Amino acid sequence: MSLLDTLQRGLADLDAQGLRRVRRIADTACDARMTVNGREIVGFASNDYLGLAAHPALVAAFAEGAQRYGSGSGGSHLLGGHSRAHARLEDELAGFAGGFSDAPRALYFSTGYMANLAAMTALAGKGATIFSDALNHASLIDGMRLSRANVQVYPHADTAALAALLDASEAETKLIVSDTVFSMDGDVAPLAELVALAERHGAWLVVDDAHGFGVLGPQGRGALAAAALRSPHLVYVGTLGKAAGVAGAFVIAHETVIEWLIQRARSYIFTTAAPPAVAHAVSASLKVIAGDEGDARRAHLAALIERTRALLRNTRWQPVDSHTAVQPLVIGSNDATLAAMRALDAHGLWVPAIRPPTVPAGTSRLRVSLSAAHSFDDFARLEAALIEASEAAA
């Protein structure tokens, strides 16, 4: 059988299981109301939690950065591509989100995937043991595989099981790895307990705050700040394409850890740096996030979250107990979830169906992603359509 035959058979299998993914094409900027595939829709699919992706100040900063630095970086960070905009942003990020460390330093990456690969592969290797939450993001899992470290997976958020694994470990280097906000459930990791376990066992804790940075904590400083945690054993990863509304990611840790990543993280060294204009726009985003406007947007988002939690409890399906902008509604089968998605789409609402392998088999779900850009009128449309779809499925 040829490769094409094998691939075609695999695609047919995906179709039969209701698992083929289809891209939609946005014709306008990411916002609550968009034109997608030529239709006006209200989107509940993006990770633009603060509604900053089309913010005029960020758009202007992006254009200003392109005028000043050009359209591309021209090289890797170590070979000519590291601009003043990148360096300034790293200093700003360390000051903004590095309060957990006495000597924080930040390192900017082009994507969150690359940042997580860097943390896993450069900090762990043969002889090390990584203790991973069962629901960690795919980028962390891929990084663990590439690291060649021993990986032990503990049940989701089960700190007792994690403690038992740590007690039994004789590894010299131990890394506990966890998302902060889990992207498909919306729940928050038991961070205080994880920090305590790391310190008790001489381990390091690596947290991926992709869905918390900009939203959680005072001024949006993230999940660690929300829990008022400080520790010399922390490595903090955050992304800049979700609440921050631009692109890229970062790692913040003790300055020695960051210097090691610069020297040894292959996903940092062997790739072209992101355009400086992107970093320039992120600097503008941080000003909005940390200011009064950021506080107002987080307050509006919090109100939407509470309304959505109440709404999901009134459907026939199973809501997940989430207090974040990620509001899942577990339906079960792939076909039923796709049918619910199509019913909402008929009302001009884009609420994506999340299916295996992203979530376990039998737990396919709608994932309502909320944004400060949503109005209460947008929520009312979602409420009416979701109740109708739920009743029709009964």
Curated annotation (Swiss-Prot):
Residue ranges of the TM segments: none
Residues spanning the signal sequence: none
Name listed for the protein in its UniProt record: 8-amino-7-oxononanoate synthase
InterPro entries: Aminotransferase_I/II_large (IPR004839), AON_synthase_class-II (IPR050087), AONS_Archaea/Proteobacteria (IPR004723), AONS_Proteobacteria (IPR022834), PyrdxlP-dep_Trfase (IPR015424), PyrdxlP-dep_Trfase_major (IPR015421), PyrdxlP-dep_Trfase_small (IPR015422)
Residue positions, PTM N6-(pyridoxal phosphate)lysine: 242
PANTHER family: 8-AMINO-7-OXONONANOATE SYNTHASE (PTHR13693:SF100), CLASS II AMINOTRANSFERASE/8-AMINO-7-OXONONANOATE SYNTHASE (PTHR13693)
Leading EC class: transferase
This enzyme's EC code(s): 2.3.1.47
Subunit text: Homodimer.
UniProt: substrate binding residues: 21, 137, 358
Family label: Belongs to the class-II pyridoxal-phosphate-dependent aminotransferase family. BioF subfamily.
Top-level lineage group: Bacteria
Matching NCBIfam families: bioF
Function, as annotated: Catalyzes the decarboxylative condensation of pimeloyl-[acyl-carrier protein] and L-alanine to produce 8-amino-7-oxononanoate (AON), [acyl-carrier protein], and carbon dioxide.
GO biological process, any: biotin biosynthetic process
Disulfide bonds: none
Matches recorded under SUPFAM superfamilies: PLP-dependent transferases (SSF53383)
One Pfam family matching this protein: Aminotran_1_2
Gene field: bioF
Taxonomic source organism: Burkholderia cenocepacia (strain ATCC BAA-245 / DSM 16553 / LMG 16656 / NCTC 13227 / J2315 / CF5610)
Cofactor requirements of the protein: pyridoxal 5'-phosphate
Reactions catalysed, as given in the entry: 6-carboxyhexanoyl-[ACP] + L-alanine + H(+) = (8S)-8-amino-7-oxononanoate + holo-[ACP] + CO2
GO terms, molecular function: 8-amino-7-oxononanoate synthase activity; pyridoxal phosphate binding
